[in-house]
Amino acid sequence: MPRVEIEINPVNRITTDAIGPPGKRVFYILAENDEQTVTLIAEKFQIQSLSAGIEQFLVEIAGKFPELQEASPDYDQDVMEIKPPVDPLFRLTDIGLGYNADEDMVILVIHELMPDGTEEEPGIVRIWCTRSQLRALGHWGIEVVNRGRPICPQCGQPEEPEGHFCVKKNGGHKRN
């Protein structure tokens, strides 16, 4: 049996955000309805992957169900931002997406990252949302990820405000 098992069906709000300065940000996924709020810690690459996966997933749904109205990507930044303090339930390891055609609802199934050697079954959170809520989450996720440190055009690594050691420029360069 999972260490923790939560289902939010449906959510009033689902979002992701990063708190902290670029280079030291902590990424979160938050889901809430009138009864509960669940916050989970994620990695930047997980938010990037989720955002890309959401768009691909919604395109697949539209292909299977062409009669459905297109999901809106619109969001209100004030609603999408996560305000500290946050109390994360756990750090996530993976996210799965599913679709219930009868209800026209999407489910995110999120599993907990457990330390090596732990015998407990990982926690699981199931979040039900509309296709438009999911698409807004994906678009906002891209916005959040892109707010980080700029990427060096030479080596593809993040740049610090004071510059960085760039192997392709033989040592480094300062930002203007």
Positions of the model-derived regions?
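Short microdomains enriched in Cys/His and/or Lys/Arg
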Residues: 172-176
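The feature marks the first
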Residues: 1-52, 56, 60
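Intrinsic, low-complexity N-terminal interaction/targeting segments
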Residues: 1-21, 68-124
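Mixed-charge, glycine-accented linear interaction segment located at domain edges/termini
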Residues: 40-42, 110-163
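Beta-strand-rich binding-surface signature
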Residues: 13, 26-28, 39, 94, ...
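Short, structured motif recognition centered on aromatic/hydrophobic residues
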Residues: 25-31, 50, 54, 106-110, ...
